[in-house]
Amino acid sequence: MKRLLKSLKTKPMTLVVSLPENTYEMAKAAWEAGADAIKVHINLFHNASLIKFGTIEEQRPVLEKILHDSPVPVGVVAGENTKVSEGVIEELVRMGFDFISLYGHHMPVSLCNRQDVSNLFAIDYSYSVEEVKTITNSFIAEILELSILPHEEYGSRLNARDLSRYLAFSQVSNIPTLLPTQRLIYPSDVQAIANCGVKAIMIGAIVFGHDLHQMVEQIKLFKQAINELKQ
């Protein structure tokens, strides 16, 4: 387990694909196109894809099939409520998820400092650099997700000030940082993002919508940009 964490620690940049819908077709297309890891969702309304994801029981058949067949690590967002998420953590681990992603203020204590699954600790715009320094130099988190954009700014173009914020968080973090595409990010931005110390880019609905063919095309373009990174 913890294959994503190993990738973040050993590769210059890792490409994670956040599926806009939990379908086997999309998952298979993502790993075949070159995704290094994929992420699914349960128990929440997703602000980027505008999709409501159901419970673990409602989605168990497709999730189990994805987990069984995927050659790359699969992670899951366990919800948007601490108590609800806490109630499914052990089952998600039993199912074989490699990492579990939650905002820090939704993450149950039971997900900290585990050996059997990685926690992907997401921060929003309310977390200060000083707080992140404490979090990422402790037992609390293993991977830091920079989900720092207010919802009303989703889909707006990446700008230079964003880079300064990614750099600030990466500089104080003792764990790998992962950037989700809340902003509109192009493959041509990958080098600048890597220069900020970010170790993974997670592309999703903001980049490719819900179209499978567009998703595949963007995965290939981002993977090419990653392969061309200058050290």
Where are these regions (language model features)?
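Conserved N-terminal beta1-alpha1 strand-loop-helix module at the mouth
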Residues: 1-72, 136-140
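N-terminal active-site wall of soluble small-molecule enzyme domains
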Residues: 2-4, 46-95, 102-113
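Active-site mouth loops of central-metabolism enzymes
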Residues: 7-25, 74-84, 118-127, 177-185
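Catalytic cores of alpha/beta
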Residues: 25-30, 83-94, 126-138, 183-201
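Glycine-rich phosphate-binding active-site loops on the catalytic face of alpha/beta enzymes
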Residues: 37-48, 95-110, 143-153, 194-218
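Glycine/Thr-rich beta-alpha phosphate-binding loop at enzyme active sites
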Residues: 46-54, 133-167
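C-terminal helical cap(s) of enzyme catalytic domains, especially alpha/beta-barrels
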Residues: 52-54, 112, 158-159, 207-231
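Active-site/ligand-binding-proximal alpha/beta "capping" segment
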Residues: 148-198
